[in-house]
């Protein structure tokens, strides 16, 4: 079947009332960004639907795949746009039925948004079903469990006919909910947390703490790859890589071993807080999960949060670990996250970290060195990368260059 349009159904933005225009415009911008590099289409965003007009050479499968990854889209259907005459609609229904297997069953489903159309829903269903049965003697009607369903939408401008409904990602268009800073460690949880807030329309930039030589270049490239996977859905994402070695070594030198984990995360939060204000973000996001590890008890979260007045969002707070793993597999980050390259959260891990840190004690331990100067130095030396869906690490670039030189 050669389709001439894609019908894009909106997600929750249909509930946004007077703000709907803002949401539709943002979604249209996101669609155009996602489809960059492809041609043969025109995007037309309307109040209740988006239509993508396709030229003959358009790559409909690739366009549909990219659309399915965009937040704010409920579903996509390849459709035929048909004139509002019974002859044209019947001919299109027969065209659909030509693809059906022998002895298969079908039904006609009609939705009539144009109430001025001369035939009501049931009349049109009977007319089209009759036309198909008259043309083919090896298929039959089954309205309860059909093998095929020809869907007909009677709109004001035309008739749209389709069979397939491709699920979208739902949620709200990214860019309608403000900006946040995602603390991206390289583990399983934080990329999922980032995806969860983006699904609510929030834009993210990411911050990663890198402690060479204790953390490797492979750990850094792993985080770049996780950011690239997130960028496939929303376009370019800025990744801020913090040189954290000096701070981390000092914490492990002067803070009691049981409190190093708490203090290290307080330092991370202080750095993130400064960056939040620099980039104009409204909140910090992390992948913390209540009770999962020593630093993620309520007592620990209280001690760590105390260093910032910026809201800290924890989308995964009450998830089971298995739920998080399932989500990471769904979004395509799991295999990268489990690569065995240590990040700064796993090095210097004490054998017996405190789970209910005494707030006064951690403040006392930190008072013996000038961490503020070190934090400022770390912020000043942040490396910022803009990661796109086709971003290649330095290693990949060098490999490609060697291959090209060899050829």
UniProtKB/Swiss-Prot annotation:
Pfam families: ThiI, ThiI_fer, THUMP
InterPro entries cross-referenced by the UniProt entry: Rossmann-like_a/b/a_fold, ThiI_AANH, ThiI_fer, ThiI_N, THUMP_dom, THUMP_ThiI, tRNA_STrfase, tRNA_sulfurtransferase_ThiI
Keyword Transferase found: yes
Enzyme Commission identifier(s): 2.8.1.4
Major site of localization recorded for this protein: cytoplasm
Function (record text): Catalyzes the ATP-dependent transfer of a sulfur to tRNA to produce 4-thiouridine in position 8 of tRNAs, which functions as a near-UV photosensor. Also catalyzes the transfer of sulfur to the sulfur carrier protein ThiS, forming ThiS-thiocarboxylate. This is a step in the synthesis of thiazole, in the thiamine biosynthesis pathway. The sulfur is donated as persulfide by IscS.
Catalysed reactions, semicolon-separated: [ThiI sulfur-carrier protein]-S-sulfanyl-L-cysteine + a uridine in tRNA + 2 reduced [2Fe-2S]-[ferredoxin] + ATP + H(+) = [ThiI sulfur-carrier protein]-L-cysteine + a 4-thiouridine in tRNA + 2 oxidized [2Fe-2S]-[ferredoxin] + AMP + diphosphate; [ThiS sulfur-carrier protein]-C-terminal Gly-Gly-AMP + S-sulfanyl-L-cysteinyl-[cysteine desulfurase] + AH2 = [ThiS sulfur-carrier protein]-C-terminal-Gly-aminoethanethioate + L-cysteinyl-[cysteine desulfurase] + A + AMP + 2 H(+)
GO cellular component annotations of the record: cytosol
Protein name: Probable tRNA sulfurtransferase
Family named by the database record: Belongs to the ThiI family.
Protein's UniProt keywords contain Nucleus: no
Cited SUPFAM superfamilies: Adenine nucleotide alpha hydrolases-like, THUMP domain-like
Top EC category: transferase
GO BP annotation list: thiamine biosynthetic process; thiamine diphosphate biosynthetic process; thiazole biosynthetic process; tRNA 4-thiouridine biosynthesis
Pathway: Cofactor biosynthesis; thiamine diphosphate biosynthesis
GO molecular function: ATP binding; CCA tRNA nucleotidyltransferase activity; tRNA binding; tRNA-uracil-4 sulfurtransferase activity
Name of the coding gene: thiI
THUMP domain boundaries: 61-165
NCBIfam families: tRNA uracil 4-sulfurtransferase ThiI
């Amino acid at each position: 079947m050669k389709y001439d349009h894609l019908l894009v159904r909106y997600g929750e933005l249909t509930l946004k009332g007077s703000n709907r225009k803002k949401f539709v415009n943002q979604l249209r911008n996101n669609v155009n960004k996602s489809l960059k590099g492809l041609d043969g289409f025109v995007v037309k965003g309307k109040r209740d639907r988006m239509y993508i007009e396709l030229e003959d050479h358009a790559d409909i499968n690739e366009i549909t795949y990219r659309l399915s990854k965009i937040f704010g889209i409920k579903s996509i259907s390849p459709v035929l746009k048909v004139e509002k005459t019974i002859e044209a609609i019947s001919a299109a229904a027969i065209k659909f039925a030509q693809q059906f297997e022998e002895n298969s069953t079908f039904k006609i489903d009609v939705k009539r948004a144009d109430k001025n159309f001369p035939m009501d829903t049931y009349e049109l269903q009977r007319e089209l079903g009759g036309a198909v049965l008259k043309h083919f003697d090896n298929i039959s009607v089954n309205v309860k469990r059909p093998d095929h369903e020809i869907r007909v939408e009677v709109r004001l401008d035309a008739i749209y006919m389709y069979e397939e409904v491709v699920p979208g990602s739902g949620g709200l268009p990214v860019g309608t909910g403000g900006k946040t800073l995602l603390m991206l460690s390289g583990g399983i949880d934080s990329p999922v947390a980032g995806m969860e807030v983006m699904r609510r329309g929030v834009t993210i930039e990411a911050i990663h703490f890198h402690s060479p030589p204790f953390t490797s270049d492979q750990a850094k490239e792993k985080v770049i790859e996780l950011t690239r996977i997130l960028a496939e859905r929303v376009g370019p994402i800025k990744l801020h890589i913090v040189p954290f070695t000096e701070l981390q070594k000092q914490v492990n030198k002067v803070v009691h071993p049981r409190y190093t984990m708490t203090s290290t995360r307080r330092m991370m939060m202080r750095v993130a807080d400064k960056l939040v204000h620099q980039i104009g973000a409204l909140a910090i996001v992390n992948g913390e999960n209540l009770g999962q590890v020593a630093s993620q008890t309520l007592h620990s979260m209280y001690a760590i949060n105390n260093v910032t007045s910026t809201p800290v969002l924890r989308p995964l707070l009450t998830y089971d670990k298995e739920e998080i793993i399932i989500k990471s597999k769904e979004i395509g980050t799991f295999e990268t996250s489990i690569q065995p390259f240590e990040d700064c959260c796993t090095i210097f891990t004490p054998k017996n970290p405190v789970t209910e840190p005494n707030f006064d004690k951690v403040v006392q331990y930190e008072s013996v060195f000038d961490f503020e100067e070190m934090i400022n130095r770390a912020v000043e030396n942040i490396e910022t990368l803009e990661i796109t869906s086709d971003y290649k690490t330095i290693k990949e670039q060098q490999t490609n260059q060697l291959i090209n030189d060899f050829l």
